[in-house]
From Swiss-Prot:
This is UDP-2,3-diacylglucosamine hydrolase. It comes from Nitrosococcus oceani (strain ATCC 19707 / BCRC 17464 / JCM 30415 / NCIMB 11848 / C-107). One of its GO terms (biological process) is lipid A biosynthetic process. Mn(2+) 1 binds at residues 8, 10, 41, 197. Substrate binds at residues 79-80, 122, 160, 167, 195. Its main location: membrane. It is an enzyme of class 3 (hydrolase). One of its GO terms (cellular component) is cytoplasm. Its cofactor is Mn(2+). Binds 2 Mn(2+) ions per subunit in a binuclear metal center. InterPro entries: Calcineurin-like_PHP_ApaH (IPR004843), LpxH-like (IPR043461), Metallo-depent_PP-like (IPR029052), UDP-diacylglucosamine_Hdrlase (IPR010138). The keyword Hydrolase applies. Mn(2+) 2 binds at residues 41, 79, 114, 195. Belongs to the LpxH family.
Amino acid sequence: MATFFISDLHLGTGKTEIQLRAIEFLSQEAPYGDALYILGDLFDYWIGDDAPTAEGLAIITALRRLADVGVTLHFLSGNRDFLVGQVFSQASGCQILSDPAIIDLYGVPTLLMHGDTLCTDDVAYQRARARLRRPAILRTYLALPKSWRRAVAQRLRRQSQAHVQHQPLTIMDVNQTAVETALRIHGVKQLIHGHTHRPAVHHFTVDGHPRQRIVLGDWDRGKSALSCTPEGFHFSDSRILEPRFGNLQG
């Protein structure tokens, strides 16, 4: 019995090593679990379910095989793949989750997010995020030819990379007040998210009660996967010095 969590693989053209790591994980490790949660940015960009890349099709096939052996799959979109939809869901076997989502993780209420909405200090990003997700903007974009959509996505990706390079690290990280507010609003003990590419386990208190925030890592330099059993967590990431820790109780 185990539940897996991954995020921020950013699969796409020219990322053969990451693609191979992902396929290996999905075919050799994940089948031993009961559930897999993908918390966004599985793909570097996703321009619509009608235009999957070769890399995307390979991952969809691997996910479907995992679903067919009985593993429950969940997908919560990130800032790079928020156009993943029902066609992807049906093909891969993934259930689409809203952001945020709350699950019962072996008796512990746990909040799942991609994590970008917690980076409230990056005002420019939050404004751009809200603008890009307007229904009218999405309808217009999805009506464009695939080649145009791909060009727009690549341009936005370049702009995002340039934005990140010119921002202080503190602005690009989550805001602690936003984290604590999310935990209060949803009445949960712990939070699991990705987005920042800073894998870590943070312990703190909210209103005098212990709380836990687990940050999933990117896959650029190796696998980053979190697993949880009734006995606790194991964080498979070379950047985590103490990979085993408890599922927060109380």
